Amino acid sequence: MSIADKPGFMPGAVAGYMASQGAGFLGGLIGGFIAGYSVIFLKKMTKNMSKQFDGMKSMVIYPIFSLLITGVLMYFIIGPVFTKINVIVANWLNNMGTANAVLLGAVLGGMMSVDMGGPINKAAYAFSIGVFTDTNNGAFMAAVMAGGMVPPLAIALAMTLFKDRFDEKEQQSKISNFILGLSFITEGAIPFAAKEPLKVIGSCVVGAAIAGGLTQFWGVSAPAPHGGIFVIPAMPSVHSAIFFVVSIAIGAIISGVIFGVIRGKKNN
């Protein structure tokens, strides 16, 4: 669902092109919002115009004036600001020590499990994909991918290791959670988190944070913003591939054991 529908296409496309000149992913994201909401603003400003101008509104007023608004803001404000931010972020990443990278990786990995597809999850993902697209650094992309894969894998492992603590209906989702986890689809754990939020989220955040931190400790880099285990063949080195899997396995096992232990036996 778009913000402004068809009239927002041209200013949105221009915002994306201008962002590619240095403002990067986040600059393009903000430019898209500016394009969409500028059309909405123009619609409100012209709503009292005579109906005979309706054709001109959609053909001339909305696309041209929204393009002017978006272009001016992108050229004079968004572009320069986010170009500078991208330079700062690139320098910061290049000078970041291992300890700081591990800490940030753990935070990002943990955030992926806090709300499993919600705004906190999306904030961590947006930061990492922004760094990935603007600096070609896939380190934090590996952290969020590992962290996001842990919850469904942990649930599936808990059902495997603690069979007496899950009823038959819950056990039916074991295979699907394995598949979703390996595919980096965190939302597979949501039904369990909805039933027992503190136990599920608490246990998953621990393992996801550990997985995210370990990817940074071992210098893992992801070659794509999504894909789970399917990105492994494209990883830059065998080292990254091996320790990406090891990081996820450690995090999932820790979370799965914690959840299985604290859940207790199911009620009959």
Summary of predicted features, one role per range:
Residues 1-51, 58-266:
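Pore-lining transmembrane helices
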